[in-house]
Amino acid sequence: MKNKELKILLSAPRGFCAGVERAIEIVEKSIQKYGTPVYVRHEIVHNKYVVDDLKNKGAIFVEELEEIEDKTRPVIFSAHGVPKKIPEDAKNYNMTYVDATCPLVSKVHREAENLNKAGYHLILIGHQNHPEVIGTMGQLPKGSIDLIQNEDEAKNYKIQNNKKISYVTQTTLSVDDTKDIIQILKDRFPNIKEPLKEDICYATTNRQMAVKNIAKKCDLFFVIGSRNSSNSVRLVEVAKKSGCSNSILIHSQSEIPVSYTHLRAHETLDN
């Protein structure tokens, strides 16, 4: 491979979505407004470099409000959203809080609440323990929403007390995998109520489509992102399914396998 000309294809669109950019800006403006430190509950977005940069600017990241020693300081909720209980707890602590939840995630929250009020039992299609899933499930009373993660769970799902059902989804899922799960639910429960609009974020969809378009042309595919980022992990899966089995998630240049570090680009193209 030493003498082979190397062509680099850049996926387009790429980079942060509007919700991530908005959340980062909220933290930076809060630091300017309130001074330091500013607390952030959970990583504001799942990106190591962003988190480290904000730490250097004066943000302190915690997982729970109880960890905040000085509760006179403001706290920011991450882009993934939080259970309804968290803002209530912040009020009980007399804390100033700023909600950086992505507007598209907030839309799913409102949708779930409205369906619950209309008498529907909710199914949430998503990944267990992901902050967004925890936040969405935390909008509703316990027992009124169930999580389905894969096709097998969809095939085995049972309706309790013959309730009418509806579904919402995590915003950062694989478009194709989610479509298959939804189809199983629709086949099994013809009267299941669908969301008015698809819940998967348009930026997630666009980036997955972009990866599909170029992965089949590639011998090697790098997704640059963090391992706890649902979007980044899904893009690797999409690249592999689209024809590039040699697809790797890295968060920095240092993670490029040694066997590839001698390669030099002959041409770089936006695709």
Model regions: which residues?
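Short acidic active-site motifs
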Residues: 153, 206-210, 255-257
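Active-site loop-to-helix "anion-binding N-cap" substructures in soluble metabolic enzymes
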Residues: 3, 7-141, 146-158, 175, ...
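Short glycine-centered, acidic/aromatic-flanked micro-motifs in structured strand/loop junctions
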Residues: 12, 42, 169-171, 225-226, ...
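Active-site rim loops that border cofactor/substrate pockets in soluble metabolic enzymes
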Residues: 188-218, 226, 233-242, 246-250
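Conserved acidic residues
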Residues: 73-74, 165, 219
